[in-house]
């Protein structure tokens, strides 16, 4: 990863470096935490007992590889602050997350996902010279069903698009 580009905010594929990356015989985990004293990786693969992550030379990234980790397993980062306190945190670059109230990340093998939007990508308009409107919303807190359960993404699509337009 281009570290200078990351620090300047000019890199848009940090997900290729950060997060949990499945390899043939192991999973490599990386995260960015410049203010952490140390980080331990906890998950199903180590019975939720911490595996200390290695700090990068610049001190801002942490990394470790786990041989018995597999796609579908749950994990979190146990992040220690300078005062010794810690918090268990999901992976901000995780490719899968548990549904709340649970908060663990889920190891996903991106090679197992096949995009099927090639026709749409071919037909979409080139609108780089037109204004762009970005609407950011947290779907879980935007709207719930009357019985206090959450909508599916498909159901929210039908509600949110007309709302934003």
Language model region names:
Residues 1-28, 56-150, 155-159:
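The feature marks proteins involved in alpha-glucan
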